[in-house]
C-alpha cells in the first residue's frame, strides 16, 4: 500500500480530462496536477524546449513525493517521455501509447485519423505506436495548432464552431472510421469536433485507457492507497491562479477547488 499521491502534468489544462478519469476510476487515490499554462502550447516549441519544460513539471511533482507520474499531454509524451523516464526511478505513464492501443482495437476498416499538435504529429508517435500493434492499419495525421489554445480560451459557441470547422477541413474528405483525439485538450471540444466529422466516426479519447492502465500498474505494484487514508486533490498552475481556478472548477464539476500558482522551474 502507498498513500502518496498520483502526479499528473500537462502543458495547460487539457490534462484535467485525464485527471478526471483517474479520479473516477480510483476515488481513494490522492492526486496532484500541474498545468504549465505560462508556457503553453508546447506543440509549436522545439524538442529541446519541450523536454526542458516537461522536466521542470516532473521535478515539481517529484518534490511533492508522488508515487507515479502521468503525462496528461500528448506532446510531452511523444517528445519528452522516453528521455525523462531514463532520468527518474518512478514509472511514467503516457497518453500516446494508451490512445494507440484503443485506436488499433476500435477501427474496423483499418483506417485511423489522428489530430494533434504540430510536435505530436511531427513525431509520428501515433503512427508508430498504432502500426506497432497492427502494421496493416493506415494512419493519417493532421496537425491542429489552433485547437488547444481554443480550448483554453473557452470562447463563445459560434467562435468554437467556426475555428473547429475550419481546422478540420482536411478531414472532411479523408478515409477513416476512427478518429484519435491526440491532444488532451480536444475532448473539451468533442461536441464541436463530432459536428464536423459526423456521428458515424468512432472517437478515441486516450484518457479512459490511461486511467485503466494506471489502475493496473498500481494494482500490480501494490501501490494503491489504503481505503482509510484521507483523499486530497491539489491543483497548480504556472499561469494565473484565479482564472485557472475558475476553469478547473467548471471542467472538474467541483466548486471547492482552489488553484495555486507555482514557478515549476524553481
From Swiss-Prot:
Belongs to the aspartate/glutamate racemases family. SUPFAM superfamilies: Aspartate/glutamate racemase. Gene3D superfamilies: 3.40.50.1860. Its EC number is 5.1.1.3. GO terms for biological process: cell wall organization; peptidoglycan biosynthetic process; regulation of cell shape. This is Glutamate racemase. Provides the (R)-glutamate required for cell wall biosynthesis. InterPro entries: Asp/Glu/hydantoin_racemase (IPR015942), Asp/Glu_race (IPR001920), Asp/Glu_racemase_AS_2 (IPR033134), Glu_race (IPR004391). It comes from Lactobacillus johnsonii (strain CNCM I-12250 / La1 / NCC 533). Substrate binds at residues 10-11, 42-43, 74-75, 184-185. PROSITE patterns: ASP_GLU_RACEMASE_2. Pfam families: Asp_Glu_race. The keyword Isomerase applies. Keywords: Cell shape, Cell wall biogenesis/degradation, Isomerase, Peptidoglycan synthesis. One of its GO terms (molecular function) is glutamate racemase activity. The active site is at residues 73, 183.
Amino acid at each position: 500500500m502507498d498513500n502518496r499521491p498520483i502526479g499528473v502534468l500537462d502543458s495547460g489544462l487539457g490534462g484535467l480530462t485525464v485527471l478526471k478519469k483517474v479520479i473516477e476510476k480510483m476515488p481513494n487515490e490522492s492526486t496532484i496536477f500541474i498545468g504549465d499554462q505560462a508556457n503553453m502550447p508546447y506543440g509549436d516549441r522545439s524538442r529541446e524546449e519541450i523536454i526542458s519544460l516537461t522536466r521542470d513539471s516532473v521535478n515539481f511533482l517529484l518534490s511533492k513525493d508522488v508515487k507515479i507520474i502521468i503525462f496528461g499531454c500528448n506532446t510531452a509524451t511523444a517528445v519528452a517521455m522516453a528521455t525523462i523516464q531514463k532520468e527518474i526511478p518512478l514509472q511514467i505513464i503516457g497518453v500516446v501509447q494508451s490512445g494507440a492501443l484503443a485506436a488499433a482495437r476500435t477501427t474496423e476498416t483499418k483506417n485511423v485519423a489522428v489530430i494533434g499538435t504540430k510536435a505530436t504529429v511531427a513525431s509520428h508517435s501515433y503512427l508508430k505506436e498504432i502500426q506497432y500493434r497492427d502494421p496493416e492499419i493506415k494512419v493519417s495525421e493532421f496537425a491542429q495548432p489552433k485547437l488547444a489554445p481554443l480550448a483554453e480560451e473557452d470562447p463563445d459557441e459560434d467562435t468554437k464552431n467556426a475555428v473547429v470547422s475550419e481546422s478540420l477541413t482536411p478531414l472532411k474528405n479523408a478515409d477513416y472510421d476512427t478518429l484519435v483525439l491526440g491532444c488532451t485538450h480536444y475532448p473539451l471540444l468533442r461536441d464541436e469536433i463530432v459536428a464536423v466529422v459526423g456521428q458515424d466516426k468512432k472517437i478515441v479519447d486516450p484518457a479512459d485507457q490511461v486511467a485503466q492502465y494506471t489502475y493496473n500498474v498500481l494494482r500490480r505494484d501494490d501501490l494503491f492507497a489504503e481505503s482509510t487514508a484521507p483523499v486530497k486533490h491539489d491543483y497548480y498552475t504556472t499561469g494565473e491562479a484565479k482564472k485557472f481556478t475558475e476553469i478547473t472548477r467548471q471542467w472538474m464539476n467541483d466548486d471547492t477547488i482552489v488553484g495555486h500558482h507555482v514557478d515549476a522551474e524553481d
